[in-house]
């Protein structure tokens, strides 16, 4: 595919294999470009871990493949998001269940997007790196690369914590 953004212009469903290939190609192209800052917030509730990202307007991004099913809460904004076979345009507030096994791509429009992934966390783990290893297939770029840069420093904002 000459234009990796064509993933967002698809007018018909494609196979899961084709969609995955398009997401990976987009990811590779994006890693060659200047990176935008996406704020990540972590919230811990009893048995639940919420990871919220705040995505600036006009951003194109890819996520990591998820190892587990999870819930998504699109709190605000409009984003085109790849599914396993097509692209959906979602506007918050909106919630949905997301299956394991897929890497997604997103394209934000004129307003910032606030996107929260909600995961079961039965042992109430608060170690972000451990949670990432449980929840994602951590790529050699992106999450893993960022970990190497911060060398274990806790660079997350925790909010809404409750004492267990």
Language-model-detected regions and their locations in the chain:
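Glycine- and acidic-residue-biased ligand/ion/polar-headgroup-sensing regions
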Residues: 66-85
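Short acidic-glycine-tyrosine-enriched beta hairpin
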Residues: 52, 83-104
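Conserved short histidine dyad/triad with adjacent acidic residue
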Residues: 48-66
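A short, N-terminal "cap"/entry segment at the start of jelly-roll beta-barrel domains
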Residues: 1-52, 143-164
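Short hydrophobic/aromatic-rich beta-strand segments that constitute the beta-sheet cores
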Residues: 62-63, 81-82, 98, 117
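Structural motif
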Residues: 78, 103, 112-114
């Amino acid at each position: 595919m000459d234009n990796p953004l064509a993933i967002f212009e698809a007018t018909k469903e494609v196979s899961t294999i084709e969609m995955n290939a398009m997401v990976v190609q987009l990811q590779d192209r994006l890693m060659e470009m200047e990176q935008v800052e996406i704020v990540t917030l972590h919230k811990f509730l009893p048995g639940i871990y919420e990871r919220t990202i705040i995505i600036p307007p006009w951003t194109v991004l890819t996520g990591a493949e998820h190892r587990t099913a999870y819930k998504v809460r699109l709190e605000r904004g409009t984003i085109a998001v790849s599914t396993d076979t097509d692209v959906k345009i979602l506007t918050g507030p909106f919630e949905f269940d997301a299956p394991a096994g897929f890497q997604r791509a997103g394209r934000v429009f004129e307003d910032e997007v606030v996107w929260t992934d909600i995961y079961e966390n039965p042992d109430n783990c608060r170690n972000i790196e451990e949670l990432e290893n449980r929840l994602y297939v951590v790529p050699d770029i992106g999450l893993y690369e960022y970990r190497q840069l911060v060398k274990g420093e806790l660079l997350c904002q925790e909010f809404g914590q409750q004492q267990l």
